[in-house]
Amino acid sequence: MNEFDQVNNLSPLPRKEIINMQSYSAPLENRRNLLRLDFNENTLGPSQKVYEAIKDINLNQISIYPEYNLLKKFVSNHYYESRQFDSEEIGLFNGADAAINAIFNSFGDRDEIFLTTNPTFGYYSPCSEIQGMRKITCTYEGDNFCFPIKQFQEKIIKFKPKLIFICNPNNPTGTVLRAHQIIKLAELNKKSLIVIDELYEKFNGDSLLPIIDFEKIKNIVVIQSLSKTAGLAGLRIGFAFGHKSIIQHINKVTGPYDVNSFAVTAALAALKDKSYIENYVSEVNKARVLIEKKLEPLAIRKHFGGGNYFLIWPNKDPRILTRQMRENGILVREMKNKKDIENSIRVSIGTQEQMSFFWTTYKKLDLNN
């Protein structure tokens, strides 16, 4: 029995959008005890202060529903030293993915236009398909994957999209769109909600948040998380920043207690330990310089952007190399079925020691043949 027959034999039937869509599933199993350079996570884990805060959670905290005011207050006052936020301009979510899904649930309409780039983070597409939206994409330009700003402007004016998603820096190309360019895009059509996914922003330091005034620019939402820098990917904590009325509508489609008490406690401890995050980001950026210098003289294509990852087009079949790297203790991500970057692998950047291990292994497997 094929998938179509299986669905037709179901009672009740799921929505037709669900039947027709492909699920987003990342191959994240059996990754323990390996050097994880495949999903752009923090490769060291959270700070000692996070461990201590979680260890000190008492049973009473587990048995009652989580409270968010303390974390929201801290984020309001200390997330960026250069500015403060109104607590109503902040949404807390069970990871950035939950924030993305909630935005589509609250603003995505059937047959409305969803505009994004290609290639980009794969979770945007299924979220738009669930809502029955029409997806339009702009392709990155040239070998350096420059942002297609002119294409984007033309499509905003022509199609007046309901939702626009820009991953900035983009995953997987690392392309960066500057803050002033984003604000200009928002001004082209104020009925378009522009969502800026800034999960990797700390690695290049060009966030909208220090400069944007949500009272003046109401059609921008900024998403961040603590997965890539603070090492909290397993606890799932994400933030959405925007005009208070926009955040209020997004919150309507989430559960009242979606973020658990462990995540709240860990997030507060991580945000208070800013030096740990700063030191980790600094170490990753030093490791980027190290691996860039190693790869520079090689006659193979490679691309570094603004995130904690890079692309490389190996001599070997990327599927074979990915498997062999795993057999040697290192996970990397094959970029199959992704426009303009097929036959490449994406490599997360860890510490200098970790990238030296990557280099030794990669050289042995792909260059010494």
Q: What kind of region is each of these model predictions?
A:
Residues E327-N328, N337-N369:
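PLP-dependent enzyme catalytic core of the Aspartate aminotransferase-like
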Residues N285, P297-N328:
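Conserved PLP-binding catalytic core of the aspartate aminotransferase-like
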Residues N2-G95, A102, N369:
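N-terminal small-domain helix-loop-helix segment of the aminotransferase-like
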Residues L59-N189, Y200-I217, V221:
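Conserved core of the PLP fold type I
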Residues L71-K72, G234, G306-G307, K339-N343:
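Short acidic/glycine-enriched loop/turn segments that link adjacent beta-strands
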Residues N219-L295, I300-H303:
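PLP-dependent aminotransferase class I/II
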Residues G242, I312-K316, I349-T351:
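Short beta-strand-to-loop capping motifs
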